[in-house]
Amino acid sequence: MGESIMEQVEAIIAPVITEQGLELVDVEYVKEGAHWYLRIYIDKEGGVDIDDCTNVSHLVSEVLDKHDPIAQAYMLEVSSPGLERPLKKDEDFERFTGKLVRVLTKEVYQGYKEFTGYLVGLIEDDIVLEYEKERMAIPRAIVDKANLTFEF
């Protein structure tokens, strides 16, 4: 079985983004209405600006045109992951330890599908949060999404 479009795109664009001193945070390939969108989220220490996004858009467009992993027409969007960036890689969970996060699960876990708390980190294969001095270990296998959440 071959790689998914997302895996192919990530493999093609990651080196280009890394060469610019940026981090590839996430890639989405979604259909909205009649149009397909390839969304690439990038970041760096101190955040990205419009020039970073424009530069990456041009570079990624060139390399994707060369390798052509996507058959149909799509719109390319490059942006910052925003304040509520997704946490996907092990490094994300290490880097954002102590930050407020929101975790959504694919199924009900201990009576809930949504958890918010301060990230303790990854322990074995659980995402560990602390809220009001209680710790909750959520199995990563049932996590649908994990994001930083903005504190007011």
Curated annotation (Swiss-Prot):
Location relative to the cell: Cytoplasm
UniProt cross-references to Gene3D superfamilies, sorted A to Z: Ribosome maturation factor RimP, C-terminal domain (2.30.30.180), RimP-like superfamily, N-terminal (3.30.300.70)
UniProt main location, coarse: cytoplasm
PANTHER family the record matches: RIBOSOME MATURATION FACTOR RIMP (PTHR33867:SF1)
Name of the protein in question: Ribosome maturation factor RimP
UniProt keywords, alphabetically: Cytoplasm, Ribosome biogenesis
Single Gene Ontology BP annotation: translation
Pfam families in the record: DUF150_C, RimP_N
Functional summary from the UniProt entry: Required for maturation of 30S ribosomal subunits.
Family affiliation: Belongs to the RimP family.
Gene name per UniProt: rimP
Gene Ontology CC, one term: cytosol
Biological source species: Desulfitobacterium hafniense (strain DSM 10664 / DCB-2)
